[in-house]
């Protein structure tokens, strides 16, 4: 088939959107299913949420952090504003606080689906992509977060990504330290940006008398084996010390349970973790663009109901970037009149059977349709 300029123009998609073609689409579906199957085998029950819902339900409480990434449309039936989900976590939290409010806690849920965002990023230009993840509702603290970390790492390994780096963070640590030092919210915000950028010289100059306490944090970023002793030795005030101790406990628990995993620590990281209220984490792998996913502890709140929650979300575009594509299943061209039992037997042996809708089912037609085999007179696949 010849593609004309007019056809090509009609196929042009907006920035950040793309078609996924064979065999990549099948590989993504299979990988998502492997991940969610591991989650389900560990007690996480599957849920499915709508792509679009009323704005007030989608952007409530901590989920307001995603408001800037949410497409909005007017519902022509109710005349109410609706939002296209930019993240599934907030929808699962809504389910837990409403339709599953009476379910016993801790409530373990798993999900997968497409999300759409207003803008991409430099590392992730895609605006539409698949998420898969877990949410642990009604449980917080180190043990719950460690469960999220370790199960996500295990699922990635079973899906084909055995070498993963876990970067452990604590978004509330720096704000707690700034409050203890008596810094204004505006100054604390500026310092947080500089510390995220690892511009410790500028942060010290801006902090004034508080420079010493903040500068000490510079040695707490990096491989856990080196950073943890430095972090443990810091003399921090009450609330900040509590966050630090939680991060230390989480790191030690993950390192003990999964010694094969590379663990790094960055208590200064905050960007993208705006609605997390405890320890958080990000996942990386060699060959993948940016983060594979992230997670942590956050408040599940809806209509005044607040309960501790934690979980993890994987970004499938990044996960697939880091994986080696498997060899495609062998394809065999078969006559459209082939007995159903014979076709099923071939498929059970791992063959993809492609029906020949014309009388010609020979080698030339097989090659044209991307089949490496045809059936011989005895019904056995032979290479062409």
From Swiss-Prot:
Q: Which GO terms describe its molecular function?
A: histidine-tRNA ligase activity
GO cellular component terms given for this protein: cytoplasm
Work out whether the entry's keyword set contains Cytoplasm: yes
An example of a Pfam family matching this protein is tRNA-synt_His
The superkingdom listed in its UniProt entry is Bacteria
Which Gene3D superfamilies does the record cross-reference, listed alphabetically?
A: Bira Bifunctional Protein, Domain 2
Q: So, what pathway does this thing act in?
A: Amino-acid biosynthesis; L-histidine biosynthesis; L-histidine from 5-phospho-alpha-D-ribose 1-diphosphate: step 1/9
Its subcellular locations are: Cytoplasm
Q: Which SUPFAM superfamilies match?
A: Class II aaRS and biotin synthetases
- Keyword Secreted attributed: no
Query: Any idea which UniProt keywords this protein has?
Result: Amino-acid biosynthesis, Cytoplasm, Histidine biosynthesis
Q: Which family does it belong to?
A: Belongs to the class-II aminoacyl-tRNA synthetase family. HisZ subfamily.
Miscellaneous field: This function is generally fulfilled by the C-terminal part of HisG, which is missing in some bacteria such as this one.
How this chain assembles, per its entry, is: Heteromultimer composed of HisG and HisZ subunits.
Stored PANTHER family: HISTIDINE--TRNA LIGASE, MITOCHONDRIAL-RELATED, HISTIDYL-TRNA SYNTHETASE
Q: Briefly, what is this protein's role? A: Required for the first step of histidine biosynthesis. May allow the feedback regulation of ATP phosphoribosyltransferase activity by histidine.
Protein name, per record = ATP phosphoribosyltransferase regulatory subunit
Q: Which organism is it from?
A: Rhodospirillum rubrum (strain ATCC 11170 / ATH 1.1.1 / DSM 467 / LMG 4362 / NCIMB 8255 / S1)
């Amino acid at each position: 088939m010849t593609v004309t300029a007019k056809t090509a123009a009609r196929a042009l998609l907006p920035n950040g959107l793309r078609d996924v073609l064979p065999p990549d689409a099948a590989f993504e579906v299979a990988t998502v299913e492997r991940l969610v199957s591991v989650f389900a085998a560990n007690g996480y029950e599957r849920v499915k949420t709508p792509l679009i819902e009323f704005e007030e339900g989608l952007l409530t409480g901590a989920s307001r952090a995603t408001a800037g990434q949410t497409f909005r449309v007017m519902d022509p039936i109710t005349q109410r504003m609706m939002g296209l989900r930019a993240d599934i976590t907030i929808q699962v939290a809504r389910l837990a606080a409403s339709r599953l409010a009476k379910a016993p806690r801790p409530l373990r849920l798993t999900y997968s689906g497409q999300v759409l965002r207003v803008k991409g990023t430099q590392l992730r230009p895609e605006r539409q992509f698949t998420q898969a993840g877990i949410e642990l509702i009604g449980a917080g603290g180190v043990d719950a977060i460690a469960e999220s970390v370790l199960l996500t790492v295990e699922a990635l390994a079973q899906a084909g990504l055995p070498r993963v780096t876990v970067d452990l963070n604590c978004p509330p640590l720096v704000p707690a330290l700034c409050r203890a030092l008596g810094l204004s919210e505006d100054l604390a915000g500026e310092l947080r940006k500089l510390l995220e950028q690892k511009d410790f010289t500028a942060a010290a100059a801006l902090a004034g008398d508080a420079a010493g306490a903040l500068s000490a944090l510079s040695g707490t970023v990096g491989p856990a084996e080196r950073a943890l002793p430095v972090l443990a030795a810091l003399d921090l005030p009450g609330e900040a010390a509590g966050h630090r101790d939680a991060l230390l406990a989480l790191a030690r628990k993950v390192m003990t349970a999964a010694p094969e995993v590379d663990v790094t620590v960055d208590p200064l990281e905050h960007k993208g973790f705006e609605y997390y209220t405890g320890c958080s984490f990000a996942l990386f792998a060699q060959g993948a663009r940016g983060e594979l996913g992230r997670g942590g502890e956050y408040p599940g709140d809806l209509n005044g109901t607040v309960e501790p929650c934690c979980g993890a979300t994987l970004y499938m575009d990044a996960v697939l970037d880091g994986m080696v594509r498997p060899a495609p299943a062998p394809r065999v061209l078969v006559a459209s009149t082939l007995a159903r039992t014979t076709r099923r037997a071939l498929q059970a042996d791992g063959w993809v059977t492609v029906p020949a809708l014309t009388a010609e089912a020979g080698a030339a037609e097989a090659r044209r349709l991307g089949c490496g085999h045809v059936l011989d007179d005895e019904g056995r696949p032979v290479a062409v």
